[in-house]
A protein has these predicted regions:
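Thiamine diphosphate
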Residues: 1-145, 149-152, 160-293
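Generic beta-sheet signal
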Residues: 72, 100, 135, 158, ...
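Short, structured loop/turn "capping" segments at alpha-beta junctions
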Residues: 154-156
Length: 293
């Protein structure tokens, strides 16, 4: 199976041939995969080198010129480092763009803290008007990327090397129904959540899109006041959105995800998953403890 990042490069390269509005802005990362497309479309495949602030500003300028820019690099260099440019050159100018990241929270664990970005979605939550996709499989990534390229607004697509074994619908979906509570599984954490809740009487909702938050589906399927969010980025990021969705109803919310504590050992992505309590056995303990409290 190809990775989400490989699928992104392949699909986007094909669409550059079909859509004259599409432009790709790179900062070295993944540039080899766009080499052929760059030779075919040298005016719409732009590698700026390791200058991430310029990456975003260039995307804003292309949007002002009527193009649909796609800016890509690792998440920490796409959202965190050039955040001021996102705020000013995209949001303040009110132009659309697609930001496509790789690396996620700890995919590149050997790269150390500089290449880890668990706070990216929370940071974008401080700005209005963003759609945020967190696909759980390359097939979902392709669907969501195609939708993002056809849209007009600001879209963040968060790619990861962590994937579910099988693709799920690229929209909010009920995977399991129960009576004791609701677990919302985001993107690549669907498989760990299903394994963790196999013996629990809970509803499991899956969503590869977290902004806008799937409020209506949550309200329609809620069978008990307990809601557990399992997100592959900073723990609790979607608690405010969940609280707004269930305003006026008695609710208890638990946010599971990447902890804010600093881990100063490299390890593997699997080591980080366990350290943050996102493996099936840890999730089972956390969810069971919350439901029985």
């Amino acid at each position: 199976m190809d990775t989400m990042r490989e699928r992104f490069a392949a699909v986007t390269s094909r669409l550059l041939d079909e859509d004259p509005r599409l432009a790709v802005v790179l900062a070295v990362i993944t540039s080899d995969s766009f080499a052929d497309a760059g030779r075919r479309h040298p005016d719409r495949v732009i590698d700026l080198g390791i200058r991430e602030q310029l990456l975003i500003s260039t995307a804003g300028g292309l949007a002002l010129a009527g193009l649909r820019p796609v800016a890509h690099t690792f998440a920490s260099f796409l959202v965190e480092r050039p955040f001021e440019q996102i705020k000013l050159d995209l949001n303040h100018l009110d132009v659309g763009a697609v930001l496509v990241s790789a690396g996620a929270s700890y995919d590149m664990s050997a790269g150390g803290r500089t290449h880890q970005s668990p706070g990216d979605v929370a940071l974008l939550d401080t700005l209005p008007g963003w759609t945020v996709h967190v696909p759980g499989h390359p097939d979902e990534a392709e669907t969501l990327l195609r939708e993002a390229y056809q849209a007009e607004g600001r879209v963040y697509v968060r790619l990861s090397t962590e994937t579910n074994e099988q693709p799920l619908p690229a929209k909010p979906t009920v995977l399991k129904r129960g009576r004791r509570g609701t677990v919302v599984a985001v993107g690549p954490l669907a498989d760990p959540v299903l394994a963790a809740t196999s013996d629990l009487d809970v509803t499991v909702l899956y969503t590869p899109t977290v902004r806008p938050f799937p409020a209506q589906l949550l309200r329609e399927t809620l069978a008990a006041p307990e809601v557990i969010l399992v997100e592959p980025y900073l723990a609790g990021t979607s608690i405010p959105a969940t609280a707004r969705a269930l305003s006026g109803q008695p609710t208890r919310i638990l946010g599971l995800g990447v902890a804010s504590k600093e881990l100063r050992h490299y390890g593997t992505p699997g080591d980080h998953q366990k350290a943050h309590g996102l493996d099936p056995s840890s999730l089972h303990r956390s969810i069971t403890a919350f439901l029985t409290a």
